Structures are given as structure tokens and as C-alpha cells.
């Protein structure tokens, strides 16, 4: 409908859309002068990368605020650089020190093409990382018919995009989702076959979580091995490996430098720390049982040991979604006398165990928390899991972040009072 517009032109026309950009970087770009071509500031231009897969996008995806499956790439022909309205830079226009800007295509050889074309996700040095993100900047706007092709995640997204294009009169537009285009543009798990995201985005995680909660509610065990939560907790305290998924993480070493213990030992420590928190004792007896079970189970998605080379777990941003089928097996086969609320809470606490920490320290958005809480104790238990998880690794994290944690609690309470 509008093609692509510069930030300033978009603002002048009152066009609003979902923004995944970093505010601090955008402020820099709003003031950074472009020293050639039409001049002005970076926000007077529509930016493109020369590289197919940028460290900036990886950083955005790692914050868990967007689903990479919904990211599309718009490509323009390199000949666009010959237009007088186009400039380019030898590195990103994101840092405190501006890049060098050029308006003569003969200066393209001054860019670090080895870095730009490299398949390495993040170069080892900051300077090379910024050079990899050299930009082509088109003044004001670019009409949609100037694009060469679009790259999308898969055939499903291709169909959706093609329908949108047809709605606006673009029939038979070149939308690509072939394996080579996918491999070159998206951050995917290189250890498995297929199109597997390295981070589960918020929409997919929420949808999967809701589906599994519903499935578990409809398939409560008829002959559970443990009659209730208290029964299974007693068994775990006597034998941590009494549940297969716990046995599969017991002794699982990790190469994550912030962890001092194996995954099983860490899970036991998190559960033991609950008793040190006053908020834990403010919960009802049933809720204390729920959050304790969730603490034991919160890292089961990192297992089993058998999936890791030499039994050493690597950082895995998809472990929350991997826990869902495990939770379904445990709650549908092992544990009886669970209410629907308790099923929802256990699953939510395990899948979103990192949510509070990510919100206060890594810019994960609060809307994700709003979508999973129903009552105040949901908030309290999510915070309990987070605090005990952080304290088990580094007590300074909680000490330094306690004000932000309590402010988050207050905002979630207010949200519940106003909306539910």
C-alpha cells in the first residue's frame, strides 16, 4: 500500500505499526547526519542491509519478543545504488561513532565484503560485526514495485504473503521459500533437519502452551502412579530420578559458564530456595505444592542427556517449548488429583520460568506475562520461580533487580484488577 517509508516520512504521515527496533539505537539514527547524497539524517532514509542475515536480527530474536517465522525479507536490485537518492555506509549506522557514508558506486569496494558475505552469524570482533551490517540507504521512500523478490520462512507464510500482495494488485510476485533462501536468511537450528527456529517466539509459545494445557485437562490419568502432588513431591525428595524426565537431567552437565551445577542439581537448589521466600509462605498449601513441583520440573526441556554430545548441554533457547510434551506425559500419566487451575499453573510456570528475569534484564515485553496470568498468585509464583532461579546462580541478580521485580509485580496486579 505504502511501499517502504523512512522513519521521518512515516511519522509525518501518521503511519503506526508494530516496532521491534531498539529505542536507544533509533535515537542515535534520528540525529546521525548523512554526509553525502541528499544529506539529512539516517531517519530520512529507508535502510537495507547488504548482508542476508544480520547480527541485529539475531539480537532481536534472542529477546523473544518476535516470532522469526513472521519475519520477511524485501530485496532490491543492487543497481538501485546508482540512483542519486541512494547512499551507503561501510558499517552499521547504529553505533555512537558514525560510519563513513558514500554516494558513489565506485566506493563499494571499500566495504568489508568478506564479513558481509560470511555465513558466520556473529563475527568475533565488534568492528567486523558492525562492518557486516553495512547499510544501503534510500532517501524518503521506495515503491513496492521496485522490489525484486521477497523471502519468507515457509510455504504457509508464502501463501499468506501472496494473498496480501494480490489484494493490493501484485499478482505472481516472486515470493521465495526454497531451502537455499531459507538457509541463507534465517537463524535456524543447524543440528536438526527442517525449519526449526533457534528461539521460540511469543505467539507460537503461547499457542502451543494453551494447546497442551487443554490436552492435559482432557486427559487426566485414570490410574496415576502418584495420587497427588504431595505424593510425588515426597517421592522426588527421596529419589530425584523417580520421574523419567527428572532422571534425564540429573547429572546433565552444561557448558553455560554462569551455571556451577549440573541441570538436576540446579533444579533441586531452585526448589529448596522457595522456602526462604516469604511470598512462598503467603501462598495457600496447594499453591505451595504447585510451585514446588514446577521448580523441580522447570528445566526438564534441557534434557534428556542423550540428545547432547558427551552429555554436556549447550545453551538452548527452545527448552521451554521442548518441555511441553514432557509435561503432558507427566501430568497425564504420573500425577492424580490435579485441578484444571493447577494444571494451567504447573505448565505455565515451567514454560515461562525465565519470563520475569527476561523482562527485568533483557527487554522481553510484559504483554507476554499479561497473557498468561489469571489471578494474583500466578504473578507471585512466576516471580518466586524467577527469584529462586536467579538466586541459585548469582544472588546479586535479585539484590540489584529487586525494585524492578516488585514494580513488575505491582503492574501485573493492576493489570489483573483492571482487566480480569
Please place each PLM-identified region on the residue numbering.
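Charged substrate- and nucleic-acid-binding regions of tRNA-handling and nucleotidyl-transfer enzymes
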Residues: 382-386, 390-420
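Phosphate/oxyanion-binding active-site loops and adjacent basic polyanion-contact surfaces
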Residues: 48, 259-270, 316-323
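Conserved phosphate/pyrophosphate-binding and hydrolysis machinery centered on Walker-type P-loop NTPases
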Residues: 260, 264, 313, 398, ...
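Acidic/His-rich, divalent-metal-binding segments that scaffold phosphate/diphosphate chemistry
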Residues: 205-309
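Active-site-proximal loop/hinge segments that shape catalytic or ion-binding/gating pockets
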Residues: 1-47, 55-220
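Divalent metal-dependent catalytic cores for phosphoryl transfer on phosphate-bearing substrates
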Residues: 284-393
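Short conserved micro-motifs at the rims of enzyme active sites and ligand-binding pockets
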Residues: 60, 85-87, 162-163, 307, ...
Amino acid at each position: 500500500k505504502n511501499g517502504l517509508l523512512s522513519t521521518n516520512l512515516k511519522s509525518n504521515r501518521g503511519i503506526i505499526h508494530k516496532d521491534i527496533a531498539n529505542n536507544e539505537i533509533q535515537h542515535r539514527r534520528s540525529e546521525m547526519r548523512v554526509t553525502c547524497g541528499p544529506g539529512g539524517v539516517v531517519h530520512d532514509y529507508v535502510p537495507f542491509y547488504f548482508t542476508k542475515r544480520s547480527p541485529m536480527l539475531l539480537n532481536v530474536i534472542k529477546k523473544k519478543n518476535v516470532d522469526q517465522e513472521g519475519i520477511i525479507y524485501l530485496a532490491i536490485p543492487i543497481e538501485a545504488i546508482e540512483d542519486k537518492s541512494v547512499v551507503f555506509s561501510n558499517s552499521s549506522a547504529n553505533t555512537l561513532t558514525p560510519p563513513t557514508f558514500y554516494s558513489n558506486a565506485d566506493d563499494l569496494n571499500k566495504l568489508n565484503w568478506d564479513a558481509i558475505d560470511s555465513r558466520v552469524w556473529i563475527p568475533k570482533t565488534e568492528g567486523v560485526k558492525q562492518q557486516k551490517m553495512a547499510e544501503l540507504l534510500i532517501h524518503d521512500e521506495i515503491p513496492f514495485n521496485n522490489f525484486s523478490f521477497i523471502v519468507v520462512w515457509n510455504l504457509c507464510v508464502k501463501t499468506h504473503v501472496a494473498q496480501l500482495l494480490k489484494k493490493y494488485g501484485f499478482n505472481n510476485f516472486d515470493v521465495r521459500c526454497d531451502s537455499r533462501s531459507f538457509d541463507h536468511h534465517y537463524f535456524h537450528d543447524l543440528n536438526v533437519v527442517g525449519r526449526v527456529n533457534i528461539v521460540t517466539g511469543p505467539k507460537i509459545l503461547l499457542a502451543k502452551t494453551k494447546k497442551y494445557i487443554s490436552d492435559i485437562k482432557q486427559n487426566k490419568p485414570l490410574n496415576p502412579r502418584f495420587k497427588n502432588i504431595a505424593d510425588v513431591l515426597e517421592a522426588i525428595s527421596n529419589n530425584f530420578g523417580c520421574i523419567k524426565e527428572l532422571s534425564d537431567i540429573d547429572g546433565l552437565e552444561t557448558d553455560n559458564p554462569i551455571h556451577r551445577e549440573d541441570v538436576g542439581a540446579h533444579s533441586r537448589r531452585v526448589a529448596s530456595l522457595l522456602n526462604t521466600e516469604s511470598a512462598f509462605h503467603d501462598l495457600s498449601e496447594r499453591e505451595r505444592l504447585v510451585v514446588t513441583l514446577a521448580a523441580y520440573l522447570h528445566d526438564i526441556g534441557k534434557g534428556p542427556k542423550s540428545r547432547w554430545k558427551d552429555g554436556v548441554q549447550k545453551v538452548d533457547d527452545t527448552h521451554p517449548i521442548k518441555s511441553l510434551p514432557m509435561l503432558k506425559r507427566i501430568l497425564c500419566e504420573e500425577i492424580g488429583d490435579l485441578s484444571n487451575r493447577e494444571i494451567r499453573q504447573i505448565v505455565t510456570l515451567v514454560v515461562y520460568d525465565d519470563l520475569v528475569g527476561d523482562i527485568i534484564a533483557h527487554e522481553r515485553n510484559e504483554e507476554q506475562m499479561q497473557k498468561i496470568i489469571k489471578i494474583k498468585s500466578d504473578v507471585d509464583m512466576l516471580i518466586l520461580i524467577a527469584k529462586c532461579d536467579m538466586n541459585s546462580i548469582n544472588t546479586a541478580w535479585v539484590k540489584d533487580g529487586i525494585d524492578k521485580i516488585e514494580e513488575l509485580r505491582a503492574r501485573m496486579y493492576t493489570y489483573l484488577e483492571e482487566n480480569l
